[in-house]
Curated annotation (Swiss-Prot):
Name of the featured protein: Proteasome-activating nucleotidase
Keywords: ATP-binding, Chaperone, Coiled coil, Cytoplasm, Nucleotide-binding, Proteasome
Subcellular location, principal: cytoplasm
Species assigned in the record: Methanopyrus kandleri (strain AV19 / DSM 6324 / JCM 9639 / NBRC 100938)
Oligomer status and interactors: Homohexamer. The hexameric complex has a two-ring architecture resembling a top hat that caps the 20S proteasome core at one or both ends. Upon ATP-binding, the C-terminus of PAN interacts with the alpha-rings of the proteasome core by binding to the intersubunit pockets.
Keyword ATP-binding applies: yes
Docks into pockets in the proteasome alpha-ring to cause gate opening, as annotated region: 434-436
A GO molecular-function descriptor: ATP binding
Record localization: Cytoplasm
Gene for this chain: pan
Lineage, uppermost ranks: Archaea, Methanobacteriati, Methanobacteriota, Methanomada group, Methanopyri
GO CC annotation terms, alphabetical: cytoplasm; proteasome-activating nucleotidase complex
Record keyword Manganese present: no
Length: 436
């Protein structure tokens, strides 16, 4: 019994020792496992750090690659520009090496395709035409370029115009409207009927069977709005406005004035629809005398050319001529006959209502005091033209500026009336200071 108990105790001790040894072995294995786990975590962290470094390096390389691409594109563009410049310089060099061409004028086109050309050096040539030249552009009077050796026509040049004629083209479409003109309602209606309507609705005249006037004569005192009216018509008709003063056509050399008139109408045809406005037409259109001097005869030649040009276009063409003068009484009757300036529109000095409308137009952008009475100003400025009223408004504004004010008062206007109209009284002796 005792032996059995001792044996059991011995077995238990052995089992305990086995368990203890197993426990120690497992603890040793567990330590080894954690050690390996720590090693793996360390390697993982090192690998992750390496990956982050590689990612940063990759981003840096991608950025450098993008910069390289941009630089490459810029270099390609620079190379393209250089190639274009080199080609242009090469072309310029080739052109510089070519001998200059001679300018000539075509006088006649022959049946066999050749042309008779008068060169700028004087002699005439029967010349061949280069295949590169558009024969539709070849016509008598055309300017052409001639080869020095063969005298062949190698190019058709643009028609030559005097720089003074080109300077006459004021505006493709002036910015003046009928709202900018006061006191001329009847005159506006008349000029619209004879100028604007034929340009915008020519088919209406064809249906009715009447021809509109070719030219309109505006006459009246200076400063009454003749030029302004012509500009407004050009604007509303959407036409090119070509303005000149007739004294510009009075030239020193024989035939010079007539040539300017000819080129003026050529420009009008090119820019059609167009309105030619000739101011102070009495400078070339005065009544012709038998006992004229050489200077008078040159003026008469210019007038004759103007009459010929007006006879040379159809009333329904896209060209209208408006002339202005202060001296209708001295004009040559040939100018005023039907087919030329056959519509005469008088532009008088404005009446009181007209002056009031003009004052409203010129003061609409001004900063006026409450005491400004435009009706009174219209009443006291009898005999004033539209230009005088504009000068009065400008002078009143200048008086306010002179006193560092941003509001124009009635007193400013009265002083301006006194100054502007007083000066007119000195010149004409006609103005009466009605407000005193």
């Amino acid at each position: 019994m005792e032996e059995t108990g001792v044996k059991d105790v011995r077995d238990l001790c052995e089992k305990f020792l086995d368990f203890k040894r197993e426990k120690e072995r497992l603890e040793e294995l567990l330590k080894e496992y954690f050690k390996r786990l720590e090693e793996l975590e360390r390697k993982l962290r090192a690998h992750e750090e390496k990956l982050r470094i590689e990612a940063r390096r990759r981003k840096t390389l991608e950025k450098e690659l993008e910069m390289e691409r941009d630089e490459k594109a810029e270099l390609r563009e620079e190379l393209r520009r250089k190639e274009v410049m080199i080609e242009k310089l090469r072309s310029d060099l080739q052109r510089m090496k070519k001998p200059p061409l001679i300018v000539g004028t075509v006088e006649e086109i022959l049946d066999d395709g050749r042309v008779i050309v008068k060169s700028s050096t004087g002699p005439k040539f029967v010349s061949n035409v280069s295949p590169t030249v558009d024969r539709n552009e070849l016509e008598p009077g055309a300017n052409v370029a001639l080869n020095q050796q063969s005298m062949a026509v190698v190019d058709v040049l643009p028609s030559e115009k005097d720089s003074r004629v080109l300077a006459m083209e004021v505006d493709e479409s002036p910015d003046v409207s009928y709202d900018d003109i006061g006191g001329l309602d009847e005159q506006i209606r008349e000029i619209r009927e004879v100028v604007e309507k034929p340009l915008k609705e020519p088919e209406l005249f064809e249906k009715v069977g009447v021809e509109p006037p070719k030219g309109v004569l505006l006459y009246g005192p200076p400063g009454t709005g003749k030029t302004l009216l012509a500009k407004a018509v050009a604007n509303h008709a959407d036409a090119t406005f070509i303005r000149l003063a007739a004294p510009e056509l009075v030239q020193k050399f024989i035939g010079e004035g007539a040539r300017l008139v000819r080129e003026l109408f050529e420009l009008a045809r090119e820019k059609a629809p167009s309105i030619i406005f000739i101011d102070e037409i009495d400078a070339i259109g005065a009544r012709r005398m038998r006992d004229a001097t050489s200077g008078d005869r040159e003026v008469q030649r210019t007038l004759t050319q103007l009459l010929a040009e007006m006879d040379g276009f159809d009333p329904l063409d896209d060209i209208k001529v408006i002339a202005a003068t202060n001296r209708k009484d001295i004009l040559d009757p040939a100018l005023l006959r039907p087919g030329r300036f056959d519509r005469h529109i008088k532009i008088p000095l404005p009446d009181e209502e007209g002056r009031y409308e003009i004052f409203k137009i010129h003061t609409r952008d001004m900063n006026l005091a409450e005491d400004v009475d435009l009706q009174k100003l219209a009443k006291i400025t009898e005999g004033a033209s539209g230009a005088d009223i504009k000068a009065i408004c400008t002078e009143a504004g200048m008086m306010a500026i002179r006193e560092d004010r941003d509001i124009v008062t009635m007193d400013d206007f009265l002083k301006a009336v006194d100054r502007v109209m007083g000066k007119k009284e000195e010149e004409s002796g006609e103005f009466k200071r009605a407000y005193h």
